[in-house]
Amino acid sequence: MTKKHNGSQRVFGRRGRRDIPLENDAMFAEVMRRKDLCIGLLETIFEGRRIRDIVYEDGLSPEAQKYIAFNPGNKSIRLDVYFEDGDTVYDIEIQKADKGNLPKRTRMYSSMMDANMLDKGLEYEELKDSYVIFICMFDPFEKGLARYTFRSICEEAEGLPLGDGRCIMFLNTKGSIGELGSDMDAFFGYINGGVSSIG
């Protein structure tokens, strides 16, 4: 029997010589450099999904603070944590303050991730599914939900998905307790007030 990863129990709340708030970008990226912690977090976010393995571009660890740029004169992006799971790529971001730009920002991130993964000469069908996930320490849409998930659908035909393989997700750490289960509640609790340790 494969041991279940539990991100909320195995990742957070440990103390050492240097305690740093987990919402710190660099600290979050450092924690996510461990494969078991990445898997644990994904299985906490996607309850019921079994993640057997994840693959990093360097073969060793996720790309923390991944930098993507195409033309010197155009805007570049820096992703907090970027990694792959089979035919899916993930970008996970921590956002402490509401700057009012998340919808357009996620559009930019998703588009540049697509352009970065599709080499010249490859077919569009070779694009991997993608998730851009923002863990927000505020309610980005002020609806009280703990999770907001967006996919492309047709406005004229109800229930008709575009099927482009793109998903944008916002996790609201101030959302309703119990909505996403006890593991996610524990994770949100650590994000809101917990620390992780290095050293």
Label the predicted regions.
Residues 1-199:
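Elongated, amphipathic alpha-helical interaction scaffolds
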